[in-house]
């Protein structure tokens, strides 16, 4: 049986099922997992969603780490990425709502959490590592 199309309500229910508690209005809910604040932001009108976790203030990040983040986005992440917005480094997963599956939503959540937790160490969204040429542990 085919999975029904994703909706904002269904997406938020699946998100809620993964955590102990959520707060915030529909379209902008948040939770805390392992001391990491994770947000599910959705815009059904434009068929877009994103899962975000605040990682660091960019002003407090060694400028050399920005290059490490870009390399990690290529070699050590799957579908989630490091991103910078308004002076903040985030881990982020973006997807159209209508084609999002339950498994992709859960995987995106897990990857965002892993990137946030692995910032400063492996910079990886999971155990996958294609290896950064010329990069040692940072």
Feature names for model-found ranges:
Residues 40-52:
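Short, well-structured hydrophobic secondary-structure segments
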Residues 124-138:
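Short, highly charged C-terminal tails/helix-capping segments
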Residues 50-88, 92:
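Short, internal acidic amphipathic alpha-helical interface segments
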């Amino acid at each position: 049986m085919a999975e029904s199309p994703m909706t904002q309500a269904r997406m938020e229910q699946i998100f809620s099922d993964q955590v102990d508690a959520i707060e915030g209005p529909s379209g902008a809910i948040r939770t805390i997992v392992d001391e990491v604040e994770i947000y599910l932001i959705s815009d059904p009108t434009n068929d877009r969603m994103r899962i975000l976790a605040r990682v660091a203030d960019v002003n407090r990040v060694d400028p050399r780490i920005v290059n490490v983040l870009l390399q990690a986005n290529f070699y050590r992440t799957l579908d989630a990425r490091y991103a910078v917005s308004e002076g903040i480094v985030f881990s982020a997963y973006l997807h159209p709502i209508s084609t999002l599956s339950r498994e992709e939503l859960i995987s995106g959540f897990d990857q965002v959490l892993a990137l946030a937790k692995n910032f400063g160490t492996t910079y990886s969204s999971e155990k996958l590592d294609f290896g950064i040429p010329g990069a040692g542990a940072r």
